[in-house]
């Protein structure tokens, strides 16, 4: 299962690959044309000062030696240890050259088998022309493919808002129904169980729902199932979510500031913020009110708000009130107005982290 997930990540990184993305180089030479075909997508809406490079397998030894040398001096690797590559890196004024996916000691063999260890992220001067940088690197024999670090955009810029205290009262018929769980707002979740109550929604139509009531008769969740929410951060302290959060026990019981479980990430208690490379956040906004919208928490609630606990709403797989809901792993790929939010690199790291740490969905 996880092997397939890792291969899927590799496929996603090369999903835009095509044979005619770019035309001949400026000199019209066939060598430039062949080199440009290593570039698998376009620079439209790409992160400035960033490229994802897939190196030839023969180059990895030198890259890893250069990384080890930098680590010994507690510095950041900026060169590959390969003359032809380093000439270009120097020209681009590269400030960091790191593996896209940090070493997870538990899964490194699987990672290497899938070829994911060959992906590196380059950071360089944001004033450098991305297309020119990609063209220069693509001409190097040790470079197999190049991908622009595309920025993904949220489909919705609104805010998740709490239920209004003055929400319309439900009809007597709706109030008199015996509901499967005692969460007070389940009655308003018409998309779960639609009784056709016009007081809940003017367009309510009985039976127009997801049939969750029948599903709950089979199961309301399973704590062995981990669901990764790749979104904004999840408010893991929320009273209707806290008990259903995935917990990285080795980090939780380990030493602060140390990667206790060897998965490549430090203090990832409930997941990780792949944008800021730090703690999960869910309420970061700027002075204009732009930033986190609460969507990650909203999504987590739809999946696994705790059922039958007498508060809030129900989750589709939130359990029956016996600590039997699925577990939510927060893989934060959108973070306020932070630079790098929602890029291909961030999304790829989030997906691989989920696979490496046991997420099923």
Tell where the protein language model's regions lie, with residue ranges.
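Subtilisin-like serine protease catalytic core
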Residues: 213-344, 357-360
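Sec-dependent signal peptide recognition
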Residues: 3-9
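Protease zymogen maturation seam
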Residues: 106-121, 135-226, 234-240, 244, ...
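Extracytoplasmic/secreted envelope proteins and their assembly/folding machinery
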Residues: 82, 86, 130-134, 212, ...
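Inhibitory N-terminal propeptides of secreted protease zymogens
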Residues: 27-171, 214
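Bacterial signal peptide processing site
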Residues: 18-21
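C-terminal motif of bacterial Sec signal peptides marking the signal peptidase cleavage site
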Residues: 14-16
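Soluble non-cytosolic domains of exported or imported proteins
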Residues: 79, 124-131, 206-209, 224, ...
């Amino acid at each position: 299962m996880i092997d397939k997930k890792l291969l899927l990540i590799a496929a996603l990184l090369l999903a835009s690959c095509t044979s005619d993305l770019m035309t001949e180089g400026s000199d019209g030479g066939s060598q430039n044309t062949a080199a440009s075909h290593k570039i698998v997508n376009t620079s439209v809406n790409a992160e400035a000062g960033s490229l994802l490079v897939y190196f030839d397998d023969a180059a990895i030894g030198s890259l890893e030696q250069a990384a080890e040398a930098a680590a010994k001096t507690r510095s950041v690797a900026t060169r590959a240890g390969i003359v032809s590559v380093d000439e270009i890196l120097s020209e681009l004024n590269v400030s960091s050259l790191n593996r896209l996916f940090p070493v997870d000691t538990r899964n490194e063999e699987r990672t290497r088998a899938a070829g994911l260890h060959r992906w590196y992220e380059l950071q360089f001067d944001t004033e450098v022309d991305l297309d020119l940088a990609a063209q220069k690197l693509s001409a190097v024999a040790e470079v197999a493919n190049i991908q622009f670090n595309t920025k993904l955009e949220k489909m919705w810029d609104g805010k998740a808002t709490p239920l209004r205290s003055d929400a319309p009262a439900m009809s007597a018929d709706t109030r008199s129904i015996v509901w499967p769980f005692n969460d007070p707002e389940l009655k308003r979740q018409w998309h779960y169980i639609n009784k056709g109550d016009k007081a809940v929604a003017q367009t309510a139509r009985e039976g127009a729902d997801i049939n969750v009531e029948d599903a709950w008769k089979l199961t309301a969740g399973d704590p062995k199932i981990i669901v990764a929410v790749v979104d904004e951060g999840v408010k893991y302290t929320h009273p209707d979510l806290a008990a259903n959060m995935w917990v990285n026990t080795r980090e939780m019981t380990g030493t602060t500031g140390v990667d206790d479980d060897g998965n490549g990430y430090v203090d990832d208690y409930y997941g990780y913020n792949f944008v800021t490379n730090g703690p999960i956040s869910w309420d970061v906004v700027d002075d204009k009110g732009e930033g986190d919208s609460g969507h990650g928490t909203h999504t987590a609630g739809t999946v696994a708000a705790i059922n039958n606990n007498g508060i809030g709403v129900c989750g589709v797989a939130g359990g029956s009130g016996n600590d039997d809901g699925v577990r939510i792993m927060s893989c934060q790929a959108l973070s306020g107005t932070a630079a790098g939010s929602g890029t291909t690199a961030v999304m790829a790291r989030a997906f691989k982290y989920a696979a490496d740490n046991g997420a099923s969905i």
